C-alpha cells in the first residue's frame, strides 16, 4: 500500500486516486530563460522516479509538466541577447530536452506551454472577477483579492496577518491590498502582449499553472508537485485561484522535493557555486549524477560535492561489477529482495532503503557467481529490473566501467595489448605476460581476468 507525504496535511497518507486506478499528476516545470541548473535536475529526476514507481505499481498515470514560456525573466534575457522571446524559449526548450535525455528522464505525457493557454487564462480570470475574487483597477492589470479567500495559507501554514507585516504596495501598482497578486499584467512598451478584455498584456505566473493543470487534468486531480521553493507563494496562490474559480478542491496531495546544496551551502550565482546540468554532465557520467540525485529521499536536501559524486560513482561501480561477465537474461529469483524494495518505495518513495536492498542483492550475486552462474544471472536481471525504477543500471557493464576512457587511453591499443598478453600466456611466456600487464597498468587501466576472458576498465 503506497503512502505519500502530503505537504497540505503535513502527514503521510495512504494514496487513494480520485478515479479508480487512474492517477493524474501535475508538476511545475521550467521557466525557459536559461539552461537548466542542478536544482531543476533535482526536481526532474525526483518526479521521474515517482512516475516510474507509480507505473511499476500498476497505476494508469497521466503526467503533466508545464513549460513557462513567458515571464519577466524571459523578456529581460531576450532583450539582453537581442533576440525575440520565442526564439530564446525555443532554444532553451531544446536544451532542456537534451539535458533530460542525458539524465534518462522519461518524457511527460503532456508538456503544455503557457502561451498556448492564453484564452483559458482569460476565462479563469473573468470567472474570478465575476465571483469577487479579482478586480481590474482600470490600468490594464488584474489582481487577485487574497483577503477574500478564506483558505489562504493552508498549504504553507502562513497567516495573512503575519504576511501583512512589512508588506507594501510598490510604485506603479494599483493593488487594494499589499498581499494581492497579479493575474494579468498590462502591456509595457516593447514587451510581448496578447489582447484581453482588460487591454493588451500578458499573464501572471501563478494563473498559468492553475489554467494548464485544470485544462489537462480537470478541476480536481491527484498530485501536484514541484520544488520546495515553490510552496509559497506559487503553490499557495494556485490553490487560491483554482479553488475560488471552481469551488472544488484543487489537488488532493501536494509533493515537494528538497533543494540542492553545494558543499553544504545554498546554490547561488553570488557564491559562485552555480552549476548547470550540462556543465556537470560534461564532467561526470550522467548515470553518476542521476544516482546522486535519486539515492537521497526526494524530500531531503542533497549536498553536491566531489565527495558525494565519488560515492555515487563508487556505488554504481559496485553494481556494474556484479553485472559484469554474467549473461543478460530475464529477472529470476530474489523475490525477498523485490518485497523489501517494494516496501521501501511504497513508504513515500523511500529510495535510501531501496538502494540498500540493491547492495544486498549485489552481495548475493557475488556469492553465487562462481558456484551457480544461472542463478547469479537471474539475480543480475533482477538487479537491472529494480535499477530501472531508479533510472539506472541499464547500460552494458563494460560500457559503464570504461566510461571516460575516450581521450584518456587508446582503447584499440589496450585491446591489442590484451591479445598479446593472452598469446604470451598461451606460450607460457610469463615474463612477457607480466611485462604487458605492467604496461597496461601504467596506462591507468585495470585488467580483470575471469572465466569469460579478460576485461578492462579505467583505474579509479
From Swiss-Prot:
GO terms for molecular function: ATP binding; cysteine-tRNA ligase activity; zinc ion binding. Monomer. GO terms for cellular component: cytosol. Its EC number is 6.1.1.16. Its cofactor is Zn(2+). This is Cysteine--tRNA ligase. The gene is cysS. It comes from Pseudomonas entomophila (strain L48). The keyword Nucleus does not apply.
